[in-house]
Amino acid sequence: MHALVMQHPCITAVLPSARSPEELDATGRQALASCDAIALALPAEAAIHWATALIELGVPRILDLSDARRRDPEVHYGIPELFGAPSAEARYVANPGCYPTATLLSLRPLLERGLIERESIAVLGTSGASGAGKGLADRLHFCNLAGNSFPYKVGEHRHVPEIEHHLGAPISFVTQLLPIVRGMLVTSFVRPKVEPAALLAGLREHYATHPYVTTLDQPDEGLGLGHVVGSHQALLAVGPVARSGLVPVFASIDNLMRGAASQALHNLNLWLGLDAGLGLPPPLARAPLGVPPAFATLLSTNSATNSELSHD
């Protein structure tokens, strides 16, 4: 998020040097207290500790990228296309996780419209190594992951309660690591109440006014991770009915951008009353086609093309 903020036309970063609130000197406390908003990219326990101190300092807006309060009914949950902008009076916004973002973008509109059954939802989430965190683990060593792929945290993934809470339905959820750095493809198997074309139409209707979500005609035309890595874009698609009666619904995102940093900035823009796309890579002008070169999308934070500097 720091790289995005540093190129934002309307936001100035304040970065006091302290590992805990107790280490802040008077200058650091004053600098934080003067901020319009503070983003916390910390583990949950540390985020709670810092948030408490920041509230005492009178910081008006706290954007938390941890999972500390993502299920708190008093906290705005920040997927703008699903839950809108934070209210001007809100003091706390919970930025969603990467797997929840992809899963909810693809399934929540279908459930809200009554197009799929609430039971028997099975989700396979595949992600690059960065999606498994920064902790030391054998599975993340290059010699173990390169040219390899395997499931992890089966039956105990911490994002399941978050997904079920905001989806309003139980799910079966399995995650699998890919031998890549970033990028996430989530495939959900659902039991439809209507034909797949109606599912696709439901997604298109919901996201018609949201340029950072693109619904594809076919899942095998443009769904590759190379189309989303380095971007804020989410790509969605619906497959045909299988012989089992289930339909696959797909979502691909960059787990480090839409699943974390760029979504945080999207929320912050809306919260501050700025243009939603300021500081973000521009949305796709059209749906991508075909298989992209591996990770051809380059990180770009030049937002002039989509904001036209509307606040100048």
Task: Annotate each PLM feature.
Residues M1-L145, S149-Y152, G239-A242, G277, ...:
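N-terminal Rossmann-like NAD(P) cofactor-binding subdomain of oxidoreductases
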Residues H2-A3, Q7-Q30, A41, R118-G125, ...:
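C-terminal substrate-binding/catalytic lobe of Rossmann-fold NAD(P)-dependent oxidoreductases
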Residues S66, F189, D254:
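Anionic group-transfer/hydrolysis microenvironments
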Residues E74, C98-L105, V154-E162, A198, ...:
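Conserved active-site and cofactor/substrate-binding residues in soluble primary-metabolism enzymes
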Residues H227-L298, H311-D312:
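C-terminal helical cap and adjacent loop that interface with cofactors, partners, or active-site loops
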